[in-house]
């Protein structure tokens, strides 16, 4: 499973699959992974199936599935193009959906539900990379990996305290909601998806995923590109999930590159990949903006800056400028990038302990008490202000830029300027969902000090 993002972290628009301008000899035999035809369902398997069916319903009920028809249709088109034609599997109904989670992750449930988080899709460069993620997850379902892993480990899991096993991983917001749902309904899934399956099963999913990509005429070297993207540690998280375990990711890069051989850079011309990247970004732009807000809401401020900058680089004179301003405003006194020292295992452990004990506001106060924090805060406020002003200078400026300036000025003590920006926002967006809250902020700021 391509891991790294979502609450439970499970192990990677309408464009046609990239077709080669001319057929090239595949670096490996382009055959889909064989179905585990010897697999027979037993009671323990049917019990697990019942649990994961309930998980699907809970994800929908609790608002964790992204309600965007175009995005989910896009995922379904890619997924269905990878599934071998005519394939039928007992107790499998293919579903491909996006999950509202800013952590990069993807996972497959054994009933055929494939989930990719908004956090992962926001990091990818093109459709072929998304196909690589889905192909990996499809293999887990087709080879019945979840059932086999459950059969081999369920007795051990029965003696485990699942929450203590993931104790250091205690996210809030959307991410915490997913963890809660999964641990309540199917605790085994948490272990499998956070830590991945056995090395042999994950390797099989990687290599057979490449074969599936070739069969669907996706450039298979993009499987390696996905691993390289995920190998970038933006948040410095201490818990090693399947998709952010960097030593393991490097090992996967090595054996995938070896599997592909020396043809990795020759299968698809770079210009064709660049065109595909542009098409992918056009399709994913709304989703990536949504993911920036999720990242801000869950305290993943560096990820918000990273994704917003990707959007601005792709489409500079657009609403994306506002989102980059929001990301810098909320980044506050934090450094935009972690140092090598902060990315060491010991530093990550210390940071995880601190996150458990303090709120974002407390972290802000701590950092603002240091010269570095004060310097970062000043630089990021200035950067955010410039970006908000730039957003307001666009042909169709978003009123939310006035709200952002109001929040920025209020925090820095510029009360009169904050009121003016809030009033402008209220005037331009009278039907905004936060209109009443903004009016109350205006009233509060206008009151004379006691």
Role assignments for model-derived ranges:
Residues 347, 415-433, 443:
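TPR/TPR-like (Sel1-like) alpha-helical repeat modules
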